Curated annotation (Swiss-Prot):
Gene3D superfamilies found in the cross-reference section: 2.30.30.100
Signal peptide: none
Entries under CDD domains matching the protein: Hfq (cd01716)
Record-level GO cellular component terms: cytosol
Gene name per UniProt: hfq
Protein name: RNA-binding protein Hfq
GO molecular function: RNA binding
């Protein structure tokens, strides 16, 4: 895992896992809203009424709508997604 990913991945994964609504501001000023459905090294899949694939290089800021706990859990493929949704201990 690259050093720059050490905070980003657990942050995005906690948002995804807890289904926290987010506002994502792009570098061009556009505001997107929804829930993080999945993500990898380059993109975030944002779900609202439709799913949008947002390239990370176009993102300026990610703002959670409510407080949440950040803990890291990475799957064997090196990404985060539906396969690690089960609560810990199950």
């Amino acid at each position: 895992m690259a050093k720059g990913q050490s905070l980003q991945d657990p942050f995005l994964n906690a948002l995804r896992r807890e289904r926290v609504p987010v506002s994502i501001y792009l570098v061009n000023g556009i505001k997107l809203q929804g829930q993080v459905e999945s993500f990898d090294q380059f993109v975030i899949l944002l779900k609202n009424t439709v799913s949008q694939m947002v390239y990370k290089h176009a993102i300026s800021t990610v703002v959670p709508a409510r407080p949440f706990n950040v803990t890291g859990h990475q799957n064997a493929q090196g990404g985060y997604g539906a396969q690690d949704d089960a609560p810990s201990g199950e």
